[in-house]
């Protein structure tokens, strides 16, 4: 009888152990699935070694995808097919996603490294109090030129590009707002102008630039400049920075009429499945050392004040890429234009592109 009870007790103990082991494996599987983090960013816009470092430190597996335009990113978030946990929209797209109630309200207590950010780049008009977004990188649109090819030129005005001596030697970034803004700026209008007449005037004025334009290009613009396929370019500051800092023959200027001051940001979409992981990732990127490493790799200007102090002096003190407060007074941040005006910009840009053929 005693042996019988021992067998029963042993069976019960074994059963309990089996249940505990089964529960442990299920729990581990659930934890693993929850610890995937879906990140959606611009191409070539993060030092991938930092992602590996984050994975090693946290045990969270990062599923990393890229996009090539705000519109493509916005469409995917609206569609909701993939539940991205962190995305990187520009300022005017933050406004659009915010209006559509597609962004999570941020808990700053979960991002302690937010203290590293420069107050000059916080609480901006597109997101007061940074309720929905945290700045990641910022920059401008300006003129990059070869000083050896054009030693007597300063390119301090958009109007300088129209001179016939630059025939077939100017490269333009492939962006509707960036190029139409050039025409608007030159005519004294706002970069966020919605007046169809003004947009049409800017387009008409750009047609006068056409003989000087060699091409409207994408990521290959750097290679084309290095291969002397163009000696003047309208580019984002992050494209210009590596060329200027590595080769004294280049210079980058913001024309006196003004230009765009843009911001790319980190946000958490409403549909995010791993919001805690998203906060960890954002906080990780805002760490001073991580941000400095990322900034040197990407090449754009960082709003992270603590990180900036770790950058080489020639980088952090370069006013061309870290414009002073006074300089910023003549720069404009993009706003959401609304679909009608955005269509007007795109149509005018397409007309201009067609005129180059």
Please state what every model-predicted region is.
Residues 93-96, 226-227, 231-249:
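A ligand-binding cleft/hinge motif common to bilobed small-molecule-binding domains
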Residues 7, 22-96:
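Early extracytoplasmic/lumenal segment of secretory-pathway proteins
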Residues 83, 88-229:
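Extracytoplasmic ligand-binding site segments that recognize negatively charged/polar headgroups
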Residues 199-208, 246-270, 316:
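Periplasmic-binding protein-like
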Residues 98-106, 127-131, 242-254, 316-318:
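Ligand-binding "clamshell"
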Residues 104-115, 133, 249-260, 270-272:
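Short beta-strand->loop
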Residues 269-329:
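Mature extracytoplasmic/periplasmic domains
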């Amino acid at each position: 009888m005693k042996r019988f009870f021992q067998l029963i007790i042993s069976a019960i103990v074994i059963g309990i152990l089996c249940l505990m082991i089964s529960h442990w494996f299920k729990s581990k599987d659930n934890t693993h699935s929850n610890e995937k983090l879906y990140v959606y960013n611009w191409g070539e816009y993060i030092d991938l070694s930092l992602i590996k470092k984050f994975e090693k430190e946290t045990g969270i597996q990062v599923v990393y995808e890229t996009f090539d335009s705000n519109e493509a990113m916005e469409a995917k978030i609206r569609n909701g097919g993939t539940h991205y946990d962190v995305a990187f929209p520009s300022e005017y797209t933050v406004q659009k996603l915010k209006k559509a109630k597609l962004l999570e309200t941020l808990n700053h207590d979960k991002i302690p490294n937010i203290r590293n950010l420069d107050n000059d780049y916080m609480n901006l008009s597109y997101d007061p109090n940074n309720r929905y977004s945290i700045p990641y990188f910022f920059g401008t649109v300006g003129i990059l030129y070869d000083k050896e090819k054009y030693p007597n030129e300063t390119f301090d005005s958009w109007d300088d590009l129209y001179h016939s001596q630059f025939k077939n030697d100017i490269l333009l970034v492939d962006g509707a707002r960036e190029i139409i803004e050039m025409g608007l700026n030159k005519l004294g209008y706002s970069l966020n102008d919605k007046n169809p007449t003004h947009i049409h005037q800017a387009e008409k004025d750009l047609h006068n630039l056409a003989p000087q334009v060699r091409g409207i290009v994408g990521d290959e613009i750097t290679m084309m400049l290095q291969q002397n396929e163009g000696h003047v370019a309208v580019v984002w500051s992050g494209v210009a920075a590596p060329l200027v800092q590595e080769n004294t023959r280049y210079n980058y200027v913001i024309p006196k009429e003004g230009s765009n001051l843009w911001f790319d940001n980190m946000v958490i979409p409403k549909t995010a499945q791993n919001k805690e992981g998203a906060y960890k990732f954002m906080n990780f990127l805002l760490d001073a050392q991580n941000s400095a490493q990322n900034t040197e790799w990407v090449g754009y200007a960082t709003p992270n004040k603590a990180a900036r102090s770790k950058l080489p002096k020639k980088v952090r003190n370069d006013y061309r890429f870290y414009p002073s407060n006074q300089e910023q007074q003549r720069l404009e941040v993009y706003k959401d234009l609304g679909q009608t005006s955005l269509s007007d910009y795109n149509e005018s840009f397409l007309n201009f592109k067609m005129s180059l053929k």
